[in-house]
């Protein structure tokens, strides 16, 4: 009997050690109660994920019957991105405990809110970003660029939606998907249209011939859930694969929130699938190391400069920043055939995405190599870039 107790205790201890971890989060205000992102181990196959999801669905159903957890929706969505597997759902504590104890699960994380990284400053002010990224020296508004202008490249704007009928897109924009419940297939906020036109507008954009796909993952107030962002990423990868444009696609994330490991992994795997991903550093004037998507691997993280080539006072900084780009007082298209001026690292990121698209079109550079090439091409120095931060400024190597 004593031997049995010893063995039982050892097995129980081993089970506890092997249990998946529920990652803690420093900022509780962004957490969605009882909503989780569940990431599977690398060895788990697509079929095994499907089987696991069936088990979780049954487990949740039993929990509702026993404990009356009707207010929790259970399983929501599974993610399959370039061999990476995860799912989201709302579960009670007992169901969560069973999930954590499942040997297929790597870790679990709270789903959290995420927000745009830009804000409106004024309407119809003069633009300067295009001229700045096409000249080594400051002081000119002429935009000089390779004639390919992103031709053959597709830009996915994962944002508040895009006004695809805006004349600045010249008929090159199409609607992709809306993953936000209770919203229409349009851009009532303006942020998504502005960032997409900064990257690929005919007048206001850098990659003037690129195709544009609207992917609505944020609501009409510029806020969203990481679980929806991940769903949008999965759709983009699948869409690019179906259209055979992996290797010729750019995806922009002008959003920021607290660091979410599951989201970072989803973004990284989207990049590894064959998409150049430009992201915003965030607007908190702090180190972006603890921010997502800025801290994700295999992305090109952009911080924001002013017209004077200094760090914008709101811009985040830190070692994860790959480049600075224009981000204060940027004029671009807004819904209903309008234009407007916005500021933020949200505006810096599509500058990087747009120049990246032109580089891919003109030089045939693979998405995985684009950020390193942009760093090599960069000008500067940016003034007062922040601690442990590059002083390199985005430049398209126009020769000017």
From Swiss-Prot:
UniProt keyword Transferase present: no
Domain Inhibitor I9: from-to ranges: 35-116
Glycosylation sites: 138, 181, 252, 337, 388, 396
Cleavable signal peptide: 1-19
Its EC number(s): 3.4.21.-
SUPFAM superfamilies with a match to the protein in the record: Protease propeptides/inhibitors, Subtilisin-like
Pfam families membership: Inhibitor_I9 (PF05922), Peptidase_S8 (PF00082)
Limits of the Peptidase S8 domain: 127-400
Propeptide: 20-117
Chief location bin: secreted
Keywords noted in UniProt: Glycoprotein, Hydrolase, Protease, Secreted, Serine protease, Signal, Virulence, Zymogen
Subcellular location: Secreted
Entry's Gene Ontology cellular component terms: extracellular region
GO BP, sorted A to Z: proteolysis
GO MF terms, alphabetically ordered: serine-type endopeptidase activity
CDD domains: Peptidases_S8_PCSK9_ProteinaseK_like (cd04077)
Active site feature: 159, 191, 346
Assigned protein family: Belongs to the peptidase S8 family.
Function according to Swiss-Prot or TrEMBL: Secreted subtilisin-like serine protease with keratinolytic activity that contributes to pathogenicity.
PANTHER family according to UniProt: CEREVISIN-RELATED, PEPTIDASE S8
Protein name: Subtilisin-like protease 11
Organism of origin: Trichophyton verrucosum (strain HKI 0517)
Gene expressing this chain: SUB11
């Amino acid at each position: 009997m004593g031997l049995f107790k010893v063995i039982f205790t050892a097995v129980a201890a081993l089970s506890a050690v092997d249990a998946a971890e529920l990652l803690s989060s420093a900022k509780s205000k962004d957490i969605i109660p009882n909503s989780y992102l569940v990431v599977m181990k690398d060895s788990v196959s697509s079929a095994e994920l499907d089987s696991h999801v069936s088990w979780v669905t049954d487990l949740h159903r039993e929990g509702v019957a026993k404990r009356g957890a009707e207010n929790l929706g259970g399983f929501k969505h599974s993610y399959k991105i370039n061999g990476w597997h995860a799912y989201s759902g709302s579960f009670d504590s007992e169901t969560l405990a069973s999930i954590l104890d499942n040997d297929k699960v790597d870790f679990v994380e709270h789903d959290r809110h995420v927000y745009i990284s830009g804000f409106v400053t004024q309407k119809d002010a003069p633009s300067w970003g295009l001229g700045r990224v096409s000249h080594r020296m400051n002081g000119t508004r002429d935009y000089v660029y390779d004639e390919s202008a992103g031709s053959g490249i597709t830009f996915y704007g994962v944002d508040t939606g895009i006004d695809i009928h805006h004349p600045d897109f010249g008929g090159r924009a199409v609607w992709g998907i809306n993953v936000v419940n209770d919203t229409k297939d349009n851009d009532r906020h303006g942020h998504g249209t502005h960032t997409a036109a900064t990257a690929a507008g005919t007048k206001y954009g850098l990659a003037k011939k690129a195709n544009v796909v609207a992917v609505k993952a944020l609501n009409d107030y510029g806020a969203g859930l990481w679980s929806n962002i991940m769903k949008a990423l999965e759709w983009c990868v699948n869409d690019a694969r179906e259209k055979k444009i992996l290797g010729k696609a750019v995806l922009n994330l002008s959003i920021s929130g607290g660091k979410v490991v599951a989201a970072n992994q989803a973004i990284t795997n989207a990049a590894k699938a064959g998409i150049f991903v430009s992201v915003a550093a965030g607007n908190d004037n702090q180190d972006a190391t603890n921010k997502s998507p800025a801290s994700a691997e295999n992305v090109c993280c952009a911080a924001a400069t002013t017209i004077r080539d200094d760090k914008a006072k709101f811009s985040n900084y830190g070692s994860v920043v790959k480049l600075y780009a224009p981000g204060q007082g940027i004029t671009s298209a807004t819904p209903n055939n309008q234009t407007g001026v916005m500021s933020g690292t949200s505006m810096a990121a599509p500058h990087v995405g747009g120049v990246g698209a032109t580089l891919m079109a003109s030089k045939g550079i693979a998405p995985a190599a684009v950020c390193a090439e942009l760093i090599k091409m960069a000008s500067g120095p940016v003034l007062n870039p922040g601690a442990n931060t590059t002083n390199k400024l985005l430049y398209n190597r126009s020769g000017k």
